[in-house]
Amino acid sequence: GDECEIVTMRDLKYDASTKDVDDELKPHIMDIFKSDGIVFATPIWWGGHSSHIQSMFQRLDPIYSWGKDNKFQPFYNKVFGTLVSGGGDGFQHIHGNCYNFATNLGFTVPPSCNIESKAQGMDEIVKDEQTLEQVKNCAINMSTWARVLKEGNPTKDARHGTVDVSSVGGETDYAFSDDVQEEAAGVGIVTKQNATKDV
């Protein structure tokens, strides 16, 4: 079977930053590189997602910038889903924001991987039959699409860069760079930083 890890961001001490910060959130961000997929779960707060989800957008931004600079998307071949609790109007907007962000980072969103639950809080969500059915759909589809992506490995043939940032410059010395370079070289992708390596 598949394994998953639940990370509760409110229990972590972390900085809300667009920089590569070494704090309690950093190891979990690094784990995304080794995972087959990720789910963002958030309640609706005044029609929007939580501040913790916004912090994830910000903290993953350096990876997005690195991907543009190096013409390599490290999150290709990985799947993405969302869970929004609290019900009512607004969940479509939250899914949309999350999916827009995820696809720009290279994630694939399988069908039926958007969960809406009127229940709030883990204790209530696990008792809600409708929510549990959506969770089953999401889990099966994410697992299936992750397997298909891993076996097909579209990363090697896909286009990795849509923006020419060569004239923009910017910081690219991130702590995750070496790991991503190794992955890129493994699929035969030549990035700016690994261009001198034998790929």
Where are these regions (language model features)?
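N-terminal beta1-alpha1-beta2 submodule of the flavodoxin-like/Rossmannoid cofactor-binding fold
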Residues: 1-70, 125-199
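Flexible, glycine-rich phosphate/dinucleotide-binding loops
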Residues: 13-15, 89, 121
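Short, glycine-/small-residue-rich phosphate/pyrophosphate-handling segment
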Residues: 70-115, 130-133
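Amphipathic, soluble alpha/beta structural segments
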Residues: 89-93, 117-119, 162-167
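A short small-residue
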Residues: 115-125
